[in-house]
Amino acid sequence: ATNGQKPRKNIFQHFQIQADKIASESSVLIYPGGRWIHQSGKGLKEFGKNLINDHRLSSVEFYPDAKEVFGNAADLADGVTIVTKKKEKNTAGFEYIYAVKGSEKKVHVDNPGDDLIPLNPNDIQITNKIKRFVDENNLKYLHDAILPRSLFLIESDFVEKNPTKVRPYVQGQNIDYKSEIKLLTNDKAGKAGRAKWFVANRNVITQNVKYIDEFQVVVSSANAGGQKRDNQIEIVDNHSAFGRARVALRSFKTYEEAHNFYMYATTYLIRYAFLMTDEALTSLGLLVPDIENYRADNPVLDFSKNLDEQLFKIINLDDNEIKYIKNVINTLR
């Protein structure tokens, strides 16, 4: 790939598609799990949506930890699904089995249509309350506001290819912001690269130049939802640009809005909502409510008061649900 990373392609969906064609009565296939259920990843959006809504789907057994199925023979970040389809079945819904550490939780799940189902059945009631809050307030989801990874067209090999166009950024040094910018990008291409701050001429940015003068709240593009590692959420100031190592959740003209959004995005409820969909950029934030107005005059939240308490109350969560959410976040890593 042009950015120095090796492209990866999913192929397992083709086995399911072929099995559908040749199986006379039923098929049972084992393949990576989390992303197809959430219609996330290359080639999986249409496949995942079609499969989860197929009336021939009889059961989905999901193991978040692939080692419970394969031992140390496979390290699959997506977990594993055992998917059973029956040719003659024409009834809505399917049996969903969530298997963790030797225990199973079985539930009947309706075909979700355009919605995504939570991977953990314990999350269904809470996510339904989040959806109700979004619907009742005519809000959108944050996914729609997230800016593309290629926002400033700075590839991860930019520093390697253009060593004369950058210099390391040292905190406190004088920078002429009329002609120069701070640039957050990888020092090397590929997995060995680490995101670091540099100083570069403003003219190295040729796309979306207007965003240099705004504040973005960004996360690591590799861990955007915070599932496996800290998402490194931070505010990038209005003199800066960044490469593909970061993705902007939102951009604001004022620091106040960026700071309010940052506080919102780091609450228990919103961090939990990020975990409800895969952190690949195709599905990031699909269940995160976006209140859109992050100024002090917004009608939903008072940013001068405790946001966690306000969100729990607005979403109408009971004490057990609040305790569950806090436990999910506090035991994440």
Predicted regions and their residues:
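Short, amphipathic C-terminal "tail helix"
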Residues: 320-333
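Surface loops and adjacent helix of pleckstrin homology
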Residues: 32, 86, 327
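Conserved Class I SAM-dependent methyltransferase catalytic core
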Residues: 1-68, 79-82, 261
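Conserved beta-strand segments of the P-loop GTPase G domain that flank and frequently precede/overlap
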Residues: 30-31, 248-250
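Broad hydrophobic/π-residue packing in well-ordered secondary structure
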Residues: 1, 11-15, 35, 71, ...
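C-terminal substrate-recognition regions of SAM-dependent nucleic acid methyltransferases
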Residues: 22, 66-245, 252-319, 323
